[in-house]
């Protein structure tokens, strides 16, 4: 088993080395792709846009992103996946030959296990939702039929082009092995396809959001404590990252498994608070919500304010404080874009709109 994994890892190292040597000019592109593929952009950019254009799509997108990343965390704890940037330096596989030279970058040194790839899984799930939802919206509305078929082909080609670039980016940056990004893409699609058959998420009560958030948190902590009780160190990757990352400042606490868990659960709970708030009912369920300028204003205001909000980083000196603030910060994102911002805009635009009617 170990020998087989060593061969698989060596293939990944050779792939990374090949990309870094032959595509040096593409370094900035691969870094950009990796940054864009970060799940944070699904919360801060894609969710506000889709929610105010097609509310149901926005809700499903966020659920797929959160549950997908939660499952990614559980998978990583089970699979114990290595990462190329530390494995190539830590293994004795190359004891009888020269160690391949692998470059590291500021976005390389993530601290969690490597399998499956979170970037690939998140991107696949989120973009699968967007493609299938877009096709569902335009199905029967675009005639003749061949135009819809052209749209279908274009969107799916775009989808796979995005997945290919994300996968190559993660391999190039020595953050993942090839088999890890493939597993991420397949897992992300599976999560998104599953949620296409779950309709209860669109009218879930605040109690249901609370119970699901509590269950996800309790399961993750319970699973962590169980494995720890069995002698399994689930934070083994943090030591690897701190030991083998070229620059200590490239190791960030916000890439640890618990940071990801708290951010995702905060986002889901914040969505529940927002969708069950009076501000949401007054602004997004009234006649004004059908007015295109109101929707566009909500999108623009959300993107601007969330961009400013994203620049505020919780202090990381004390881990517990960092995790609590990360949860609260993530909860504010959907709360602001779904209820607070539309409500404030409704107060400003409501009276002129009524007069025009």
Curated annotation (Swiss-Prot):
Keywords: Disease variant, Endoplasmic reticulum, Gluconeogenesis, Glycogen storage disease, Glycoprotein, Hydrolase, Membrane, Transmembrane, Transmembrane helix. One of its GO terms (molecular function) is phosphotransferase activity, alcohol group as acceptor. The chain crosses the membrane at residues 29-49, 61-81, 118-138, 148-168, 180-202, 210-230, 255-275, 292-312, 321-341. Pathway: Carbohydrate biosynthesis; gluconeogenesis. Changing residue 119 to A: Loss of glucose-6-phosphatase activity. One of its GO terms (biological process) is regulation of gene expression. Residues 50-60, 139-147, 203-209, 276-291, 342-357 are cytoplasmic. Substrate binds at residues 83, 170. It catalyses: D-glucose 6-phosphate + H2O = D-glucose + phosphate. Changing residue 52 to A: Partial loss of glucose-6-phosphatase activity. One of its GO terms (cellular component) is membrane. Gene3D superfamilies: Phosphatidic acid phosphatase type 2/haloperoxidase (1.20.144.10). It is linked to Glycogen storage disease 1A: A metabolic disorder characterized by impairment of terminal steps of glycogenolysis and gluconeogenesis. Patients manifest a wide range of clinical symptoms and biochemical abnormalities, including hypoglycemia, severe hepatomegaly due to excessive accumulation of glycogen, kidney enlargement, growth retardation, lactic acidemia, hyperlipidemia, and hyperuricemia. Belongs to the glucose-6-phosphatase family. Hydrolyzes glucose-6-phosphate to glucose in the endoplasmic reticulum. Forms with the glucose-6-phosphate transporter (SLC37A4/G6PT) the complex responsible for glucose production in the terminal step of glycogenolysis and gluconeogenesis. Hence, it is the key enzyme in homeostatic regulation of blood glucose levels. This is Glucose-6-phosphatase catalytic subunit 1. It comes from Homo sapiens. The gene is G6PC1.
């Amino acid at each position: 088993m170990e020998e087989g994994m060593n061969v698989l890892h060596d293939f990944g190292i050779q792939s990374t080395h090949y990309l870094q040597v032959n595509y040096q000019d593409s370094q900035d592109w691969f870094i950009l792709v990796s940054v864009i593929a970060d799940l944070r952009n699904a919360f801060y950019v894609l969710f506000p846009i889709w929610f105010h254009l097609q509310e149901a799509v926005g809700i499903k997108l966020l659920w797929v992103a959160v549950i997908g990343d939660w499952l990614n965390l559980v998978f990583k704890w089970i699979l114990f996946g290595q990462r190329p940037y530390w494995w190539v330096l830590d293994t004795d596989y190359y004891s009888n030959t020269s160690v391949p030279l692998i470059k590291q970058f500021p976005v390389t040194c993530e601290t969690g296990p490597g399998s499956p790839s979170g970037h690939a899984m998140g991107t696949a799930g989120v973009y699968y939702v967007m493609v299938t939802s877009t096709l569902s919206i335009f199905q029967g509305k675009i005639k003749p039929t061949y135009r819809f078929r052209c749209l279908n082909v274009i969107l799916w080609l775009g989808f796979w082009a995005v997945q290919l670039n994300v996968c190559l980016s993660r391999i190039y940056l020595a953050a993942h092995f090839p088999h890890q990004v493939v597993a991420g893409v397949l897992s992300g699609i599976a999560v998104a396809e599953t949620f296409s058959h779950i309709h209860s998420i669109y009218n879930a009560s605040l109690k249901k959001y609370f119970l699901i958030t509590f269950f996800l948190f309790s399961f993750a902590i319970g699973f962590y404590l169980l494995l720890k009780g069995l002698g399994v160190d689930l934070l083994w990757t943090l030591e690897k990252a701190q030991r083998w990352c070229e620059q200590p400042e490239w190791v960030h606490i916000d890439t640890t498994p618990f940071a990801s868990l708290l951010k995702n659960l905060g986002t889901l709970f914040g969505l529940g608070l927002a969708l069950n708030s009076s501000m949401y009912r007054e602004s997004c369920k009234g006649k004004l919500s059908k007015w295109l300028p109101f929707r566009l204003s909500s999108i623009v205001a959300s993107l601007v304010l969330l961009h400013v909000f994203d620049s505020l980083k919780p202090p990381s000196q004390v881990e517990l404080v960092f995790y609590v603030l990360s949860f609260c910060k993530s909860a504010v994102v959907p709360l602001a874009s779904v209820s607070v911002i539309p409500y404030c805009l409704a107060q400003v635009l409501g009276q002129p709109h009524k007069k025009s009617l």
